[in-house]
Amino acid sequence: MLPRVTKLNSRLLSLALLGIQIARGAITYQHPDDLPSGVDYDFIVAGGGTAGLVVASRLSENSNWKVLVIEAGPSNKDAFVTRVPGLASTLGAGSPIDWNYTTIPQDGLDGRSLDYPRAKILGGCSTHNGMVYTRGSKDDWNSWAGIIGDQGLGWDSILPAIKKAEKFTQDFTDQSVKGHIDPSVHGFDGKLSVSAAYSNISFNDLLFETTKELNAEFPFKLDMNDGKPIGLGWTQYTIDNHAERSSSATSYLESTGDNVHVLVNTLVTRVLSASGNGTDFRKVEFAVDANSPKKQLEAKKEVIVAGGVIASPQILMNSGIGERKVLQAVGIDTLIDNPSVGKNLSDQGATSVMFDTTLPSTDFDVDAALTEWTNSHTGPLARGARLNHLTFVRLPDDKLNGQDPSSGKNSPHIEFQFAQITPQVPTLGVPKQAPLPAANSYRLLLQLAVVNLYSISRGSISLSDNNPFTYPLIDLNMFKEDIDIAILREGIRSAGRMFSSKAFKNSVNKFVYPPADATSDEDLDAFLRSSTFSYVHGVGTLSMSPKGASWGVVNPDFKVKGTSGLRVVDASVIPHAPAAHTQLPVYAFAEYASALIAKSYN
């Protein structure tokens, strides 16, 4: 979760409107009129985000195939700020490279509407997220495999593919890395750069002392990506060995040949039947904006929709694929009647808690740090989040009201992500009503994002009209189920135990948010309804299901049910949120889909 754009962000985004093409082979076009005539594309990918660029890159490995990617946002090359790891928190809602969605008012959140950041730039959310690299638990993958009916997505089957895609960049004997990860669970020859966090501040020693005192609740975890993430350990990031963000745009697209064409600043509005009235959806319609002419192109083989958890169901519904009564209400003719389209939105609810401490601030001069990074790719902006640790907590059974929404016993219910709050670069979705430190503060104001990894409330994406340029209605249905608020309540109490430990006795003064006297269930629930936000890890709006199932939108081969020539590959097909930040699962699903597609054409 990232906050609204800051003055710093606006200044940085204006630094480097470079206007250069993607390096190496892929060819970028800024306007539909610039596309070359007479080119027959084998595959057209609707959306140049995390998944879309993986698919385009992998399919382009067959030099006989031509691939077109159509992306609504600009090239990532035009946004210098996205390259700098330490400035990730300045992106998101309010940014010119974000869609700037908001949800409808949430009944469970005192009627509040929430920001719902989604990237509008080449590389998608891998270009503007927090870069955290987590795989989830092996239970998540086995759960998905069982739901979908494809054991190829089970943990033991998918792990080699995950490792194949990864390029871990650090020397394991380096003291800044040694003891932070387990080399045996990583890959070294893939496209996506991954590195372990490092920092040398007093907070680290205190935090890891809690793994001794409170080992049952916060055991030390060497590597959270081994399939059993429960515990406290070091964060891993998609940052390369030059201290730059690694995204699908930088790691996959930049290694393609010239058989990939990329059209930016252009929205895919619909997929169309190639015959005009059938179920063979191999044609796309696209336009620059609502007032510009719409153009069409037909793929020789397939159209692959990769717009993400919000845009992909919007594209399908505008194309006549969805629930008949919903489409009729906005004047869209139904071609494929499927009530599952846009349903099953699974996301992670989160809140921020803050502690006043006597620890020294890790704040720094942003301008000086930016100069250092620009000159040498070193300094505080060469890293990801300010405090480089994650904790995954599994709650005891007696705190779950007789329910266990997790994927299994290896799976946590809660995540803590740590940060320092500063006036210059706020992080992790600091609520507007939360206290912020003074600009001259020399003490660390510690923040934890407390995340419910397995919210069982399900939301939806729907249309308000039949204009593809109108934003869809996003309903998270937050706290529809009581267990979701109960888990966050227990997460706050767990955080309190961590920072009331002996290790922090002389360093942490008190809760400042929520107030220290908010201890009852009723007080904490009121706090949560007023402060909870989305961690923006939504999945499931075009959920995958077994072939022949009466529910779901795509089959295990990623083909849209009832159609030919049309697949969906992105977060929308994942049945439920994992115990993870979702970028790695999206990469893995995209790698898996790419192999299936290529194999289907031998």
Curated annotation (Swiss-Prot):
Temperature dependence: Optimum temperature is 63 degrees Celsius with ferricenium ion (Fc(+)) as electron acceptor.
This protein's UniProt keywords: Carbohydrate metabolism, FAD, Flavoprotein, Glycoprotein, Oxidoreductase, Secreted, Signal
Record field: pH dependence: Optimum pH is 9 with ferricenium ion (Fc(+)) as electron acceptor. The enzyme is stable from pH 4 to pH 10.
A Pfam cross-reference name: GMC_oxred_N
Catalytic activity: pyranose + acceptor = pyranos-2-ulose + reduced acceptor; pyranose + acceptor = pyranos-3-ulose + reduced acceptor; pyranose + acceptor = pyranos-2,3-diulose + reduced acceptor; a pyranoside + acceptor = a pyranosid-3-ulose + reduced acceptor
Primary role: Catalyzes the single-oxidation or sequential double oxidation reaction of carbohydrates primarily at carbon-2 and/or carbon-3 with the concomitant reduction of the flavin. Accepts only a narrow range of electron acceptors such as substituted benzoquinones and complexed metal ions and reacts extremely slowly with O(2) as acceptor.
Subunit structure: Monomer.
Protein name stated in the entry: Pyranose dehydrogenase 1
Record organism: Leucoagaricus meleagris (Western flat-topped agaric)
UniProt gene name: pdh1
